[in-house]
Amino acid sequence: MKVTLIAILTCAAVLVLHTTAAEELEAESQLMKVGMPDTELAAVDEERLFECSVSCEIEKEGNKDCKKKKCKGGWKCKFNMCVKV
């Protein structure tokens, strides 16, 4: 009985340590990614998606063909949205 309890507690401790180490490693890998946008840039990216799709929706309502809006800074309009080139 004691051996089983010790084995269960040991497995639980190993699982906790492994999970903690995996979370730390994942956090480090996220921080190490080159070119990963921060929260401010992510908000700008969402605004670009919205701006391009709204622009095309307005043009369609006016019985005009949807002209591609020029997205700047490495972005282009595709399927009514700005996408990263």
Swiss-Prot record:
Signal peptide: 1-22
GO MF annotation: an example: toxin activity
Location in or out of the cell: Secreted
GO cellular component, as recorded: extracellular region; host cell postsynaptic membrane
UniProt KW keywords: Disulfide bond, Neurotoxin, Postsynaptic neurotoxin, Secreted, Signal, Toxin
Propeptide segment residues: 23-48
InterPro entries cross-referenced by the UniProt entry: Hwtx-2-like
Tissue spec. comment: Expressed by the venom gland.
Disulfide-linked positions: 52-66, 56-77, 71-82
Principal place of residence: secreted
Record Pfam families: Toxin_20
Subunit and partners: Monomer.
Family recorded in the similarity comment: Belongs to the neurotoxin 12 (Hwtx-2) family. 02 (Hwtx-2) subfamily.
Summary of the function given for this chain in its UniProt record: Neurotoxin active on both insects and mammals.
Protein name from the UniProt record: U4-theraphotoxin-Hhn1a
